[in-house]
Amino acid sequence: MSDQVKITPMTLNFGPQHPAAHGVMRLVLEMGGEVIERIDPHIGLLHRGTEKLIEYKTYLQALPYFDRLDYVSPMAQEHAYSLCVEKLLKCEIPIRAKYLRVIFCELTRILNHLLNISSQALDIGAMTPLLWMFEEREKILGFYERASGARFHSAYIRPGGVAADVPSDLIDDIFKFVSTFSKFMDDIDDLLTENRIWKQRNVDIGVVSKKQALDWGFSGPMLRACGIPWDLRKSQPYEIYEDLEFEIPVGENGDCYDRYLVRMAEIRQSIKLLEQCLDRLPDGPVKTDDRKIAPPKRSEMKESMEALIHHFKLYSEGYSVPVGETYMAVEAPKGEFGVYIVSDGTNKPYRCRIRAPGFAHLQAIDIIAKGHMLADLTAIIGSLDIVFGEIDR
């Protein structure tokens, strides 16, 4: 009689120093041979205590923390925070500022999806899309720099409007970029979409059902790839989105390939939105008239003592926000990015809670990847579009 051998799963560490980990992610895998039986994600390696740090800053000083959350699509986070503070202040912003916000938020969406698609392709072994797409990303970062002075951490969208009006020739350059970008997207389509190796690595990999997506709190392209047309720009419109025409791309199977297709389609919809905004962009101010919230112009400060006092008070003490609490969410490139602020009537938030879409997507990695081969894990992680700045906070 032979002794029965009990086979236990092998434990394997994936990351945190791994090129496909997209930052500082550590996964503890239980493997049955080459098949994944269980995944335990370990987070917190990039934790900085952002929510607590915000409690010690004025409402304006807290803004740059949001750029550093999802650092590949910074303006979307600033936007959510600014809308949340404006809701508490009951502050109306000029129409030109709304248009500029939407223009830069849609450029941010393109910026994010270009990085995600190129890195997903690189994880699987295709290097060409990365080289092509980073050239286009560089152009968008150039627009960021010309508008705000910074390529990444721009702090451009602020409570009360935007930091400053854009240079006169920037709008023309964005228009030129947008008009030729569809041709570039066609080239990427030709390169990837029907490529048989790309399809073999992505079709029917990491399938998520509609019920699972809703149960785990998915949003953004992850939810829409399952066939649920949920987009905050349509369902709970903010800024000027109700006046713009665009469609919500949805998938059918909820697999890695559908998530890729949804992001590709979203880039095309962003181009459509940008064309409408650039055509209709009105003239006028870009900040609210309330000098307790937005600083006065330099020319005013040279002539008016009150303007100088307003400027000094704004950047030293800040403004007090009425007592109350509110939640505001925007359709960020990765999903629903929400900010919940509790104000106690002082110049600093009493509590600020951040809802990061990537957190909900990463927590479901066990159910998504279970039963797949180890080689498929890189494709699944690439399709989740996770950044640890916002997950660890």
Curated annotation (Swiss-Prot):
Bilayer topology annotation: Peripheral membrane protein
EC number from the UniProt entry: 7.1.1.-
The protein's name: NADH-quinone oxidoreductase subunit D
Organism domain of life: Bacteria
Function text: NDH-1 shuttles electrons from NADH, via FMN and iron-sulfur (Fe-S) centers, to quinones in the respiratory chain. The immediate electron acceptor for the enzyme in this species is believed to be ubiquinone. Couples the redox reaction to proton translocation (for every two electrons transferred, four hydrogen ions are translocated across the cytoplasmic membrane), and thus conserves the redox energy in a proton gradient.
Predominant place of localization: membrane
The family this protein is said to belong to: Belongs to the complex I 49 kDa subunit family.
Any single Pfam family the record assigns to this protein: Complex1_49kDa
Keywords: Cell inner membrane, Cell membrane, Membrane, NAD, Quinone, Translocase, Transport, Ubiquinone
Catalyzed reactions: a quinone + NADH + 5 H(+)(in) = a quinol + NAD(+) + 4 H(+)(out)
Xref: PROSITE patterns: COMPLEX1_49K (PS00535)
Quaternary structure, from the entry: NDH-1 is composed of 14 different subunits. Subunits NuoB, C, D, E, F, and G constitute the peripheral sector of the complex.
Gene Ontology cellular component terms for the protein in this record: plasma membrane
Gene Ontology molecular-function annotations: NAD binding; NADH:ubiquinone reductase (non-electrogenic) activity; quinone binding
Location in the cell: Cell inner membrane
